[in-house]
Every structure is written in structure tokens, then in C-alpha cells.
Amino acid sequence: MVNKSTTNGVSDPNLENKRTKVTLTNSGVENARGTYYSGAYTSVGYDNSFNLNRFKENFKINILSESANELVFEMIGIDAPIANALRRIMISEIPTMAIEKVYIINNTSILQDEVLAHRLGMIPIKVDPRKFNFKLPNKEYTAEDTLIFQLKVKCEKDSVTGKIINETALSKHLIWVPTQDQEEMFPNEEDRPRPMEDDIPIMKLRPGQVIDIQCYCEKNIGREHIKWSPVCTASYRLQPVISVDKSIKGDKANQLLEKCPKKVFDIEDSGQVVAARPLDCTMCRECIRDPEFEQNVKIERVRDHFIFSIESTGALKSREIFQEAIKIFIEKCNIVEESINKLVN
């Protein structure tokens, strides 16, 4: 973690900036690599070791925006390896339910069976995966580990109006078929298994064409196949810090405002240019392409300040995805701790 010096009261601004910031210049990125060795700065009086109490004081999570399927929040006081571990867990290690087996009874459409099966597998299923078990290999399907959906669509032409009926097979045509006591598992209508969206196109049909399919959903994780990933995107970026020299005023200030495609800068009443909307900055560096501005505008990112964006497929809420990722991360830490204890003992 990015720690303050504990061995003296004097801080070297250049060294502190190197430890805590990533700098972007016209020619590239400087100081991108973090230094985590505890004794890296001992010779100049900095204690770079991890301190649990200091971590507890500095660590923060601030929610910037939240809806059922989208979550944007700040995580302050952690290093990139931890942030990236959480991101990877959200993408590939949180289980969901997805169509795994497809039994094609009839398919007279022009789409090949294997392509149709693949399309069905990529439709996100709205159901809480925590209510189901992982299916064991070579075992029969049970209500505890499998969901069954029926897809039966026939395209016809109305003899009176000439209108084509069921011209497009949609995800809403996937009908859940309860087995054993599954209806008791979902007493509320809104909780019952269904495709996340009703209007996902599966395929086009012409009059007389029929598809009759049984789909079996199983629980698994995104590391096995991306169809089991609970997120559309899970990403993070570092907090931007943009500073502008006070000498930029008048016409130069207006030129700087015009250079930024995201309109990050504003001019205050005093004539001073400020970065009013730093979170909108995409680090395109257009503002420092001109040598005239390169020396007067400084673009940095805070090394331990992450802005996470999570977009759910709908199987789980974005908040639940992050909570599950934390649980899995703790389990992994416990495994490492147990392994180390075995080696030591």
C-alpha cells in the first residue's frame, strides 16, 4: 500500500510523487511500475512495509453511482495486484446458470444445429445461482443442479391478413419447465427462472419452419466458458489528477479548453484554468501535445485510488457480484495462509 514515512518527518516531494503517482507525458507513461519491497526506500528514511493498522485507516470504498445492473465505486488504499485480482474474480470465478446441453427435437430452419445451440448458451438466465449446486460429472440431472427450458416455435402465415406469425424466435419463447419441487423453490412469479431480456433475437424463421428444443441449464464459472460470467464488463482505472500552471490565462486558457475533447477544464472568475471534471479525463493527452502546454499541464494518476465499473448481465445485481468476489478473495487468502502454515510447521 502507499504508506507515509514513519522514520522521519521530512518527505522528499520527488520521491513521494514517484511512490504515489503515475505520470503521463507526451512521449509515454512514466513511473508505471509500483515498488512493494518493504526496504526499497530505507536508505532515504521511508518505511515501505505493509502495516495493517495503517491500511485500516486509509482504506475506503465510496459508491459513485448504483443501479441494479451497474455499479461505479472508488476503492482507495489498495495496490494494483489486489484490484486486478478482484476484477478477474468478478469476470471468471463467480458462478451463474447458463444453457449447457441442448437437445434438438426438430430444427427445419436454415441455421445449423451447433450454431443454434451456441446462441442459446449465450442468453443470460435470470435466476439466483446460489440456490443451485454444481452438477457432478456423469450424474443424472436433478432439481438441485439443473434448470430445463423448452423452446418451441413455429412460423406461420395468417391466411386472412397475410401477416407472418413468429417471424423471429426470441428469448421470450424460452419457457421454464419446472421439475420435481422447483416450483416451491420459486414461489414468487418475479423470482422464477427466465431469460434476462425477452427481446433477444435467436433466429429468423420463414413460414413452415419449426424449432423444437429442450435446453438444460447448469451452474459453472466464467473460467470454464464466458457464458457463465456474471458481468458484461468489470474494469477499473486510476483516479486522474490534473494540475495547470497559473501562468495559463487569457487566450492560452481558451486554447487549452478547446484542446480537450471531454471538456475537463473550466476557467474560474480569476482567469485561472482548473480541471473541473477530472473523472471525465480519458488520458488522451491532447492538452499536452503542444510543447507550449506540455510544461504547464501535468497529468497524473493516483497509484492506490481505483475507480471500479461493474456492469452485470442480470443474473446477479452488480452489488452482489462485488460482494461475492470479496468472499471468494477471502477464501483464496485462507488457502494461501493454510498452505504457508503447513510449510512452516
Swiss-Prot record:
Bias-annotated ranges (Polar residues): 1-11
GO cellular component terms attached to this protein's record: RNA polymerase I complex; RNA polymerase III complex
Residue span of region Disordered: 1-20
Subcellular location: Nucleus
Cross-referenced CDD domains: RNAP_I_II_AC40
Keyword Nucleus part of the UniProt annotation: yes
GO-annotated biological processes: transcription by RNA polymerase I; transcription by RNA polymerase III
Keywords: DNA-directed RNA polymerase, Nucleus, Transcription
Gene Ontology MF annotations: DNA binding; DNA-directed RNA polymerase activity; protein dimerization activity
Any coiled-coil regions, as ranges: none
Spans through the membrane: none
Listed InterPro entries: DNA-dir_RNA_pol_30-40kDasu_CS (IPR001514), DNA-dir_RNA_pol_insert (IPR011262), DNA-dir_RNA_pol_RpoA/D/Rpb3 (IPR011263), RBP11-like (IPR036603), RNAP_Rpo3/Rpb3/RPAC1 (IPR022842), RNAPI/III_AC40 (IPR033901), RNApol_insert_sf (IPR036643), Rpo3/RPB3_RNA_Pol_subunit (IPR050518)
Record SUPFAM superfamilies: Insert subdomain of RNA polymerase alpha subunit, RBP11-like subunits of RNA polymerase
Main location, first listed in the record: nucleus
One Pfam family recorded for the sequence: RNA_pol_L
Entry similarity comment: Belongs to the archaeal Rpo3/eukaryotic RPB3 RNA polymerase subunit family.
HAMAP family (alphabetical): RNApol_arch_Rpo3
Entry function: DNA-dependent RNA polymerase catalyzes the transcription of DNA into RNA using the four ribonucleoside triphosphates as substrates. Common component of RNA polymerases I and III which synthesize ribosomal RNA precursors and small RNAs, such as 5S rRNA and tRNAs, respectively. RPAC1 is part of the Pol core element with the central large cleft and probably a clamp element that moves to open and close the cleft.
Subunit structure: Component of the RNA polymerase I (Pol I) and RNA polymerase III (Pol III) complexes consisting of at least 13 and 17 subunits, respectively. Interacts with RPAC19/RPAC2.
Protein name as it appears in the record: DNA-directed RNA polymerases I and III subunit rpac1
Organism: Dictyostelium discoideum (Social amoeba)
Phylogenetic lineage: Eukaryota, Amoebozoa, Evosea, Eumycetozoa, Dictyostelia
